């Protein structure tokens, strides 16, 4: 079945869905628009800053995307692959991907075939943690394009809800939906290393999504607690990319980076008790940590905001960090802009705009020292969690390689005791 028109619902309380508006396929099948319904215009809230409460058809401003916050409700590479394999839609437009992502997607939005009742794609109960081994085997079958039976299809179907390139699915742990991420034939034990990286980040004062390692036959999987769920309630969330594009003037390229996101949090974050300032400063620590552990996959989809007070002026909190792990690339630049030297993976670059995160230069330098002290203990921390010596040696080539180790060793907070004119410094990766 082709879907040229579908309907958007808000599922903060899944037992009482609220109709949001109508979705329409546009741009020759490469975009999806939204027009709010009358009740949502009267009682709802803008789903993102580019989706104001106006009685118009909101059109996507970038090709190949659904409009505004709706783009975060669609799957990405792995999810699309699952949908193609499981559902086999007659057409592969954005509208099909939005619909077949099902009911339990990221955030609190749902897609229905009806504006009168919430009628999402039919779904089965999530597999339980005790079925993780079987689920892993099904994922490997899909990756190898091997046939699977109906029971295996039902187990895997929830994997169409999420983005990213690597194999994942939803799994039930004690009645709560968690994300499970599988080993993907990498040369190192990525699930275990991600758990070690996330728990190391927590030691550095970074709020992270809860993770657990699941032992499987010959490998590990990683389960991640969903921060967009609180009991039976769902939290409306948007990616950093959506938030930053929403404030971008039409025709211009968005400034996708840490400093810009910090300034957005200053403006639209929860201001009561200085919560937005706390989030801005945590974002700085996250940036420094990512640089020092060689996490260069810190792109716009790997940061998110939670609308904890959807109808308030200052409604957003910085979501817990996720997908934090050393990428072992040594490329010397981040995906997200760091500072005046753009994406260069240097502490000097991180410090270049530190005042945009609500710090003085001296305060920011003290935070860098704190993160350095934690990262200096990375090897023992990883070893304690079971990372093997071969993987530790492989990671050490990057984390303790000269470009990053020299920055940890040579960073001097006294250099930032008083503001001074900045000169561009040569990258240690050059």
Language-model segments: what does each one mean?
Residues 1-296, 300, 304-430:
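Phosphate/dinucleotide-binding and metal-coordinating scaffold of catalytic cores
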């Amino acid at each position: 079945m082709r879907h040229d028109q579908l309907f958007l619902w808000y599922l903060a309380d899944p037992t009482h869905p609220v109709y949001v508006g109508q979705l329409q396929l546009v741009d020759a099948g490469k975009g999806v628009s939204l027009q709010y319904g009358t009740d949502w215009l009267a009682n709802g809230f803008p789903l993102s800053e580019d989706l104001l409460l106006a009685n118009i058809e909101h059109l996507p401003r970038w090709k190949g995307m659904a409009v505004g916050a709706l783009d975060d409700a669609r799957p990405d590479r792995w999810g699309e692959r699952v949908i193609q394999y499981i559902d086999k839609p007659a057409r592969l437009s954005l509208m099909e991907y939005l619909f077949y992502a099902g009911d339990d997607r990221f955030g609190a939005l749902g897609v229905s075939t009806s504006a009168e009742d919430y009628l999402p794609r039919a779904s089965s109960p999530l597999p339980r943690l005790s079925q993780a081994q079987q689920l892993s085997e099904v994922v490997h079958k899909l990756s190898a394009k091997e046939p699977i039976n109906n029971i295996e299809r039902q187990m895997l179907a929830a994997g169409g809800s999420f983005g990213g390139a690597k194999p994942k699915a939803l799994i039930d742990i004690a009645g709560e939906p968690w994300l499970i991420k599988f080993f993907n034939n990498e040369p190192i034990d990525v699930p275990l290393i991600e758990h070690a990286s996330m728990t190391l980040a927590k030691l550095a004062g970074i709020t992270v999504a809860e993770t657990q390692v699941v032992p499987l036959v010959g490998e590990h999987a990683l389960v991640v607690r969903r921060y967009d769920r609180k009991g039976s309630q769902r939290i409306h969330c948007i990616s950093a990319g959506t938030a930053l594009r929403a404030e971008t003037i039409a025709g211009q390229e968005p400034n996708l980076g840490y400093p810009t996101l910090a300034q957005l949090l200053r403006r639209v974050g929860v201001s009561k008790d200085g919560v937005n300032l706390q989030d801005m400063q945590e974002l700085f620590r996250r940036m420094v940590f990512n640089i020092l552990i060689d996490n260069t996959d810190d792109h716009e989809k790997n940061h998110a905001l939670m609308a904890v007070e959807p109808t308030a002026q200052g409604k957003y909190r910085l979501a817990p960090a996720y997908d934090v792990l050393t990428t072992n690339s040594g490329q010397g630049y981040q995906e997200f802009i760091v500072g005046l030297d753009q994406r260069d993976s240097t502490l000097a670059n991180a410090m270049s705009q530190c005042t945009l995160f609500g710090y003085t230069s001296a305060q920011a330098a003290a935070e860098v020292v704190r993160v350095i002290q934690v990262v200096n203990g990375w090897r023992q921390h990883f070893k304690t969690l079971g990372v093997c010596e071969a993987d530790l040696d492989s990671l050490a080539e990057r984390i303790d390689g000269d470009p990053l180790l020299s920055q940890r060793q040579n960073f001097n907070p006294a250099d930032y005791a008083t503001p001074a004119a900045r000169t561009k410094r040569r990258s240690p990766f050059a």
